């Protein structure tokens, strides 16, 4: 009986941390004027929409908060990004994030949030990749 109660408390704490992390990421998206849709309540029914926490429509990318969410098991972001040809960002509760794209897993150092010099909008990308803005399409040169 006591073990079950402890498990319930732990589950509430885990999901509480998940919702707090989602809230913090949503606040960041709002602050930098990044368009976002909260997937669990969006009514969208694609494979990524079922596991992702946010869809970033201007970039056609998905964002997954790296904490447990009720009803969601483990998500293999590397495999999913390759299969569906989408950029997936895995964001932690500490503000760190990693980018997965075309089946590649980029380290936190290689995963960046850029601001386009032309349109001023922010977008996620991998550092070895192209610096073409994922919002307006403007190319800002080779920064490698």
Give the positions of each predicted feature.
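Short, cysteine/histidine-rich loop/knuckle motifs that typically chelate Zn2+
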Residues: 116-121, 134-138
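Acidic-basic catalytic patches of nuclease active cores, encompassing PD-(D/E)XK
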Residues: 1-40
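Catalytic cores of nucleic-acid endonucleases
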Residues: 67-118
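Active-site beta-strand-loop-beta-strand hairpin of nuclease catalytic cores
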Residues: 31, 48-63, 78-83
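Acidic-and-aromatic substrate-binding clefts and catalytic sites of carbohydrate-active enzymes
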Residues: 40-49, 69-72
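Cysteine-rich micro-motifs
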Residues: 128-143
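Short beta-strand-loop-alpha-helix junction that forms the active-site gateway
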Residues: 5-16, 55-76
């Amino acid at each position: 009986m006591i073990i079950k109660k402890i498990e319930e408390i732990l589950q509430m704490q885990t999901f509480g941390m998940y919702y707090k992390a989602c809230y913090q990421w949503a606040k960041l998206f709002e602050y930098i004027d990044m368009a976002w849709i909260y997937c669990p309540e969006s009514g969208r029914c694609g494979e990524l929409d079922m596991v992702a926490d946010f869809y970033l429509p201007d970039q056609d990318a998905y964002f997954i908060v790296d904490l447990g969410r009720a009803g969601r098991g483990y998500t293999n972001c590397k495999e999913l990004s390759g299969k569906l040809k989408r950029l997936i960002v895995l964001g932690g509760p500490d503000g760190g994030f990693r980018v997965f794209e075309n089946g590649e897993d980029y380290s936190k150092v290689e995963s960046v949030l850029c601001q386009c010099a032309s349109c001023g909008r922010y977008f996620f990308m991998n550092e070895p990749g192209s610096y073409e803005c994922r919002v307006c399409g403007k190319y800002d040169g080779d920064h490698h």
